[in-house]
Design a protein with these regions (language model features):
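Glycine-rich, aromatic-lined ligand/substrate-binding cores of catalytic
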Residues: 2-126, 130-169, 173-220
């Protein structure tokens, strides 16, 4: 199968991943319909939102996030820095959330040091950061499984893909082998041996680690 070159021991040089989250129960004042999230990295860029001024750089403080709403489009930098609306409108939004005036690392340290009975959770505690990290690495899994040529359905509670066929096989390019032969571009890829796709995916999800190192006896 025509698979782009993937590196077995590191992340892809660039990737684009599309996540589709099903509709959720509505919140008191906010509807929660199905939503799509598009992830770009490695220099790949999304389309510029309609109405964004010419010359305006989307990359703000190391990255950007674009939120398409029914009334406007919001753009912010990495970690939500410097948000603005494409229309130029500046809304008078009530401040109902605790503002983090220090780094998120120190906010986490503060929460660790506080008494458990009256602790104020950090702005990105494990209950939030864990599922977020799961989403990101699930996209990396999808890139490594692209040879299946299918949309993958994820079962979060059971940490597995539900629609990979039992007999599906997958292989990965380990050497590109591109060269010019007699003036013509030639592609001579080297592939891994085919492996069962379900087992391959499960090993990536729950890796089998080797035994740890043992330190020699220390002198007293």
């Amino acid at each position: 199968l025509p698979i782009s070159l993937l590196l077995n021991e590191s992340a892809p040089s660039a990737q684009r991943v599309k996540f589709i989250f099903p509709a959720r129960d509505n919140m008191p004042k906010v509807a929660m319909p199905e939503v799509e999230v598009h992830w770009y990295d490695g220099g790949l860029m999304p389309e510029r939102p309609a109405g964004l001024p010419a010359g305006k750089n989307l990359n703000v403080s190391g990255g950007a996030a674009i939120f398409y709403g029914t009334k406007d489009t919001l753009i912010c930098g990495c970690y939500g820095k410097d948000p603005y609306l494409v229309s130029g409108r500046v809304p008078e939004a009530p401040k109902v959330l605790r503002e983090i005036t220090e780094s998120h690392q120190m906010d986490w340290v503060r929460a660790c040091k506080e008494d458990a009975d009256d602790r104020v959770l950090s702005a990105s505690d494990f209950s939030e950061a864990g599922p977020f990290n799961e989403m990101v690495v699930m996209g990396v899994l999808a890139v490594r499984l692209q040879g299946l040529n299918q949309v993958l359905e994820w079962d979060g509670p059971n940490m597995r893909f539900t629609n990979i066929p039992d007999d599906a096989m997958i292989k990965t390019v380990i050497k590109d082998g591109f060269h010019i032969k007699d003036g013509h571009p030639t592609f001579d890829k080297t592939w891994t041996d085919p492996v069962n796709a379900q087992q391959f995916a499960q090993e990536l999800i729950k890796h089998t680690y080797r035994d740890g190192w043992a330190l020699p006896a220390m002198p007293r």
